[in-house]
Amino acid sequence: MKNYIFFLLLSIITLNSFAQEFQGKAFYISKTKMDPNFGKNMPPERKQRIMERLKSNLEKNYELDFNSTSSLFYEEERLSVSGGDGRFNFMSFMSPFQGILHKEFGTKTFTNRIEFFGKFFLIKDSLPNSKWMLSGESKQIGIYMAYKATTSREVPEQVFQFGRQSENEENKKSKMKTVNIIAWFTPQIPVSTGPHKHGGLPGLILEVSADNTTVLCTKVVMNPNDRIKIKEPNKGTKVTQREYEQIRKDKIAEMREMYGRNRRRGGGSGNRSR
């Protein structure tokens, strides 16, 4: 135990003293399991069609550019599975992360640029103040020795469902739920960041599991020949995280109402409405 405490202290010292002149790029793969309650009010045939459309969105590849003061997290470019014309997109609601995320370590703030129904938003807010518990467990991830840390976080429950909801279900959607988070970090890369908004540990997070999603680092490139430029996104409507969640919730309610109207008319095409 004494050796473990000494190791952690050494890691923090390393983070402060050697993290001055370096940069790197980490590559991650994200896998999400479908929520078993998804589409519980939906006809089986329709649910199956949507599940097929969602498959490609449950596994994604991301990149994380980082230096000693900031990082930039984003999805690797690929052919779009849906148009960017502002049409309703089921897949966007199943992704645990959207857009481009810039983190500033010194101020512990983030800027997340997201496109939502054809409009760009700049979510600017404070990073979660995660209270990590270090277990002392370790494992090898690639060439790096990683150490286990756990925490929990309150997040909004998934607010989008198909079909008719009861009053109780409507009220439930505004509640929060507790998500347990397991992270594996390596002090060999002394930067306090990781995928999504995760960070605050004395080393790069190589693997993290939260809710139904696991993100695993597949490769790290330190100090590449081509210098990495980390720029904070600056185009879009500025909102806080809370304000964006309300905008998103209102839009989902609007789409649900539109979907219900189309069903009552017998069109069954709510998902194609603009």
Question: Which residues fall in each region the model found?
Answer:
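Bacterial Sec-dependent N-terminal signal peptides
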Residues: M1-A26
